[in-house]
Structure formats: C-alpha cells, structure tokens
Amino acid sequence: MNNFNNFLKKTNFNKLKNLKFLAFSVLFFSVIQSGVMAKDPLALVVSGFDYMRDKASVSVVDMTIHRPDWKRVFTIKAWTLGNKNSLFTILAPAKDNGNGTLKKGKEMWIYNPKVNRVIKLPPSMMSQAWMGSDFSNNDLSKSDSLINDYSHTIVGTEVHEKKKVYIIKSVPKPQAPVVWGMQRIKIREDNLFIEQAFYDEEMKLVKTLKFTDIQMFGGKLYPKKMIMQKANEKDKYTIVEYKILSFENNLPAGMFTLSSLKNPRR
C-alpha cells in the first residue's frame, strides 16, 4: 500500500511540474509576443523615414549600375526636404552633367540640358527605370507612399549588429494607387532601415533594397551604401554610395522649383 501511495504522490508531483512548466511556457511566449505587438508598426515606419530623411539633407553620391556585360557610374548631388521634396542633378560623367530630376509630392519632372527641355512624367512612365538603374521613378516619387498607402503588421524580429530588428509586412490599403502587392521591411530599433523587399500582386519577390556599411555619417549612424538587387538576377543591381552627406534644419523652398531643376545651386 505504501508503494502505491508513493507512486500516486510521485505521479501527481510530475503532473504538477508539467502543468507549471506549461503555464510558464505560455506566459513566456505571451510576454515575447506582447512585446512585439506592443510596438506600433506604423510608428516604426514613420520613425524610420524621419530618421533616414531627417528635416532636410544635402548629399553627393556615386550611383553604379551593374549589368553582366557593362557598368555605368554617375556622380549625383541631391537635396531633400522632408518626405515630399527632392532635387537630383548629375555632376558626372561630363556628357550627362546637368541632367536633373525634381520630385514634389507624387509629381516628377526631368530636365535635359542638351535640348533645354523640362518634361513632366506622366503616370505611364512612373514604373520605368530612373537613369537606367534598378530604381524606378516610382521609388523616388512615392517615398511617403509606404506611410500613407499601406497597412503594417509586425510579423517577427531578428538581430542585426546586436540590435533588435522589427520585420514588418506592409500591404496596400483598398484602392491605394500603388504598384506593389506587398512590401516586407526590416527596421532596426534605432530607426535604421535595414532592408526593403518589393513583391508584385502575385506575391512574387521582384527586387530588394539593402542598406549596408552602417557608420557615423552626417553626424549620426547611417548606411553608407544602398543596394537595389533584382530577384534571381545576381548580375543586375545598382549601388548608391554616399560620398558627402549633411543634415539640415531646413532648405529654401526655392530649391524645389522648375527653375532650380534647370539651374541647381551647386
């Protein structure tokens, strides 16, 4: 009888241990999950854009377009004001010097100094490559579209250089005027964009933008390089590398006009 009672006690004790372990596991994973869900995904995206773009910026970059049998390098000066206004002018090579692009909101204009002509890009041209690169005109003109036209969900986390990274799934809002069927974004806890993947309406990966070589730049941690890579095409990509970058509190409104597009301030 004593052996039987001992057996019952041991069995009940093991059951109690298992129940406690199960309860602890549920609580542990609930805490982890609630920690992820407690973060507002839209706030993360907005903070990421605010950090990356700042109030205003002036930069000089080298843009290298790489193809299997050729390579082109442009030196570009850029001015940005918030998420809506940008001005780009080509400094080199000499034959392309003075070519420019102006972005105001979702509208874009290009300037060709050889014919002294400004052209406003129609919607049908917005999906075309910008300067023959892997960045489209849409990529430049709709920098704030990710904030306004998509709904965001945190789907996981990972670690990058000992810092937490939030993985965010962004899907278009109903009737949103967007090209992509989904975007998958990785934003670090210190507001740095790490990766942005673009999917078509069939949820097939089209291209991925990676932000690399994070270092002190422009007075704060910043990715020195951005690499836009086409899916399943290792030899087709575009690298944008910052040479000069400064962040400003403001830039004159006159910087972002058709007049400045033709005659940018150097």
Enumerate the language-model features and the residues they cover.
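Gly/Pro-enriched, hydrophobic low-complexity segments
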Residues: 141, 163-256
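Bacterial N-terminal signal peptides that target proteins for export
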Residues: 4-23
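Short hydrophobic/aromatic-rich beta-strand segments that constitute the beta-sheet cores
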Residues: 59, 86-90, 108-112, 118-120, ...
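Generic beta-strand structural signal
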Residues: 80-81, 102-104, 111, 154, ...
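Sec/Tat signal peptide C-region and signal peptidase I cleavage site
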Residues: 32-38
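Flexible, processing/modification-adjacent segments and terminal tails
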Residues: 38-56, 62, 71-72, 105-107, ...
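N-terminal, post-signal-peptide region of Sec/Tat-exported proteins
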Residues: 61-95
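Bacterial N-terminal signal peptides
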Residues: 22-32
